[in-house]
Amino acid sequence: MEKGRLIMQIEKITKQAFTVVGRQGSTKDGDGFIARLWGEANEHFGEIAPFVKKDENGTPIGFWGAMSDFSLSFRPWENVFSEGLYLASAEVEDTAEAPEGWTKWQIPGYVYLRVKVESPDVFPKMIEYLAENELELVGAVHDFTDPKDGQNYMWFPIEKL
């Protein structure tokens, strides 16, 4: 996308339903709650490490800042994308059970637009892009960190599978 001064690399990806286990919080928990969740998740990662999906080199395949509306229907955050649930999580085997203190989410399959996070205004620019291209956000946006290179992405669901 090139509009104004921002250029975004947008990739269309189909991802089947998948499972994550992490530390759950909500926007009702106040400022800084996401950083606190990641701190807890990182500190206690060993508790879920045996269930984490890994690539052929033994590297976890992904860490998700998974999001949902309060009903856990995986709809976009409410009140102009400012209120909802967040799970600081790792992708795990579908059969994994969440240890005590952890939460398991099964995220539905979607066609996503994946965007590399290279500036703080990626989210509003993508919402604008969706509107300009007559695309509908059909689920909650998720943050994703690729453990191989530490790159952050945002995943915007545009079609439910």
Question: Residue ranges of each PLM-predicted region?
Answer:
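A solvent-exposed interaction/effector surface
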Residues: E2-L161
